[in-house]
Amino acid sequence: RIKRTVMQEEFLWTHRNGGYAGTVDNVSELVDGTYAVIDFKTARKPKKEEWIEDYKLQVAAYAVAVWDRHKIKISQAQIWISNEQTMDPQYFEMNTEDLKLYYNKFLERLEKFYEMFPIN
């Protein structure tokens, strides 16, 4: 459960690993005192968890950028999806270990991007 929102639609960036930027939908303090990145998505139809890997990479990258910019330690991420077909909300949660796993996958993708589009 959410205790309070600490960031909403905030632009974040980091110079870590070549740098990246994005706008996090929400960072909230939970009732247990930990913090979560919350990402809101819309879809035409319900999503299977195996279809949302890109979303998981995104929230993991946000979690690190939140630390780099604000020194707030993110312990979980939540992906909330609203779909037009059933109008039933979907909710996917990631713990600290999931965030580490997906951040490493994000770094692999970022490295490939910088190989394709070198800065220098």
Question: Residue spans of the language-model regions?
Answer:
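Acidic-basic catalytic patches of nuclease active cores, encompassing PD-(D/E)XK
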Residues: 1-6
